[in-house]
Amino acid sequence: MARLAAFDMDGTLLMPNHHLGHETLATLARLRERDITLTFATGRHVLEMRHILGAISMDAFLITGNGTRIHSQEGDMLHRQDLDPAIADRVLHQAWDTRASMHVFNDNGWFTGSAIPALLQAHVYSGFHYQIVDVKRIPAHQVTKICFCGDHDDLIRLRIQLNEALGERANLCFSAVDCLEVLPLGCNKGSALAVLSDHLGLSLTECMAFGDAMNDREMLESVGRGLIMGNAMPQLIAELPHLSVIGHCRNQAVSHFLTHWLDNPHLPYSPE
C-alpha cells in the first residue's frame, strides 16, 4: 500500500476546463481517510496552490514551480532552489530568436512583459494572475524559474539556442507542448519528491505518482508506481514504456484508477 501520493495538476488532476471534478475531490478525501499523505507536484506557483487548497479544504504538501519549492501542510518552506543568478541574467537579457513570450517567477509571483489574456484561462479556478513589468529589471538573484510560452516548433528551436547558451548549467523541460521552462540545475519534481519523502521518513518505493508531461518524467520513473495519463505527451509515453497508461483527464481518470485501487487492489485495472 502506497503511503504518499503525488499528483500533477494540469492535464492530470484538473479537467480540460481547469477545474477539479467532484469525483476527484471525493477520491482525494478517501485517500486521506486511509492515512495516505497527499502532495500536489506542479509547475504552478505556491501562492496559487495555497488558494486552491483553501478552496477545497484539503491538507497536502506542495511541490511547486516544478520542484523549486516544497511547503509543508502548515505552509512552512521545507526546500527551495533558485536559478543560478548568472543563468537567470543570461536568459533575461539575451536576445533570443523566438516569438514566444517570456514569463519570470519568484516568491512574489508571476511576471511577464505584456498582457496575454489567453494564458489566464488555465487559472480560472484560482484567479491567479500575472503582473506586467519590465522583466529585464527583475533582480536575477530572485528568480526561481523562467518560462517561454508559444508555438511548439518555435520552442523546439528556442531550446536549441538555450542549450547552446547555457550548456549543462540549467534544466530545460517542456511542462506542456506550448511551454518550455528553464529550471535550476538538478531541479525537477522527482528530485523534490525525493527530498519530501526523506523528510517524511518514507522511501520512494512507498510513493505513487500521476502525470502527463515531460516535467513529470523524473517523478514518474522514480516512484514505486508511476501512472501516465491517457492524454499525456507522446514523448513521455515513449520514454517510459514500462509504466501503465490510464484514462483521460476529462474523465477524471485519476479518480477512476484510485477508486479501483482502493476497492479492488488485487484485481487488474482497466481504464475502460
UniProtKB/Swiss-Prot annotation:
The residues that the entry says bind Mg(2+) are D8, D10, D212
Upper lineage is: Bacteria, Pseudomonadati, Pseudomonadota, Gammaproteobacteria, Enterobacterales
InterPro entries noted in UniProt: Cof (IPR000150), HAD-like_sf (IPR036412), HAD-SF_hydro_IIB (IPR006379), HAD_sf (IPR023214), HMP-PP_phosphatase (IPR023938)
Tell me the gene name.
Answer: cof
Q: Which family does it belong to?
A: Belongs to the HAD-like hydrolase superfamily. Cof family.
Catalytic reaction equation(s): 4-amino-2-methyl-5-(diphosphooxymethyl)pyrimidine + H2O = 4-amino-2-methyl-5-(phosphooxymethyl)pyrimidine + phosphate + H(+)
The name under which this protein is listed is HMP-PP phosphatase
Q: Known EC number(s)?
A: 3.6.1.-
Report which superkingdom the organism of origin falls in: Bacteria
Q: Fetch the PROSITE patterns from UniProt.
A: COF_1 (PS01228), COF_2 (PS01229)
One GO MF term on file is:
phosphatase activity
This chain's function reads: Catalyzes the hydrolysis of 4-amino-2-methyl-5-hydroxymethylpyrimidine pyrophosphate (HMP-PP) to 4-amino-2-methyl-5-hydroxymethylpyrimidine phosphate (HMP-P).
